[in-house]
Each structure stands twice: as C-alpha cells, then as structure tokens.
Amino acid sequence: ESVTDHNETVKKSLELRGIKIKVKELPIPVAFAAAFEGEIIRKADMHNEMWSSKNPTAELVVMRNLDEITDHKINIIGPDFDQAKDLALATYVEVAGKKMQPDFESVIERKFHAWFNYMEGVMHTGQRNQVRVRVSNAAYDAGLRLKDFAEVLYVMIMDEFDAVVDKCQVTLITDAAEAEKFRDEMAMPRYNARDDRLASMTDESVDRYYTCILCQSFAPAHCCVVTPERLGLCGAVSWLDAKATK
C-alpha cells in the first residue's frame, strides 16, 4: 500500500508498521502533574469558569473509522479565555483504532477529570453534562488557553490508550448555542443509550464487582464498590465502564 502525496509518506509508513510516536513533554505553559489534582480555585483567584449551572456543558468520546478523522486535529468553536469570563464547554473527542471498541468511549471520558486537574491552575469536577471547570488568574497569565486543554487530551489519550487508539481528534465548543445543540442532539442520546443498556442488568446477573478510586483526588481514603445496580457515589463510573478497563 502506497501514497501518491509524498507529504503523507512518513505518516503512512508509521501507520502501516504500527509505530506510534509519544510526546514526552506537553506543549502547555503551565506545569502538569498528579500533584496538582485536588487543587481548589477560589472565586477570587478565578479568571474563567465553565459551569453547567450557567452554560451548556458536555463531555463525549465517540469512536470513528480510521479514515473519518484527522490525527491531532484541534477545533475550537467559540470564544477563548481572553474573550469571555463565563463560557460554555462541550468537549468532543473522536478516536479511531483497529482495536478500539464502543465500550471504551466512556472509560476515556472519565479520564478527562484527572487530566484537566493535572494542569496547574485548573479545577475540574463532574462528568457528562454536569461539569464545572475553573481556570485561575495565574494560569491565564501564564498563557493557558483552550488549545492547551485540547493538547492535554490528545497527548494523554495517545499515551494512556495507545493500545486501542491510533488517531485522535479534539473539538472544544465554547459558543453557548453550539454547545447546547451538541449536548442535546449528540451527547444526551448517547448517554441515555449507555444507561438503558446498563438498566437491563442486575447485581445477580454478573459474577464480578469492581472498585473505583476516581474521587481519591478529593477524598484520599475513599473507595467505591461498583455493581450493575450501584454506581460509584459520584456516578462517574458504571459497571460496564469498570469492566472495560479490567
């Protein structure tokens, strides 16, 4: 298999050989580490807020075919942090891979919480369409912008899920009307479909339960037991999500 456009030769060669290039240092203007997880940003120290109680929010990962997306493509639809204080935020990530499965979509979504919190000066809580994100004045002054959020998602997905993800494309929507349309027409139907699938299962119909420690960034001693009929206390991880990552 070959390409006629020689600008695509290296890219195609890596794809055919199954070679993946990993970014060792994130190209963002703030520090990135697990040590910042659990950082609280007070209102007085806040430059921007994306909160579902004020504006539409959603987080969604969708599996695509390899030829349907462009690797490392980043789209920003709407104003950036320097153009508005209170913003909507729809985080839409499209992934493709030979070993990717639909069950992994929600697993990747749940990781957004940790990855955003790893950024110094960023606080993230919630999931799905109930999200709150704050950006501190210090992070904004350092140069943190929406494209950096997208870079974090791309790099971390390609690093932690390299076994199943070959391509990743990120779209961030901060335009309120577009974010609301995305939430209602794209995200909510998919959330409901996942919930309906889980609703048909009972605790007695499975032979294994799972544990979740996602909230240990804020509650270090906490651990949830996840069953088909009982999610983690925060509601972020279902039994199917946990099963997909075992």
Predicted regions and their residues:
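Cysteine-centered metal-binding/redox modules
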Residues: E1-K246
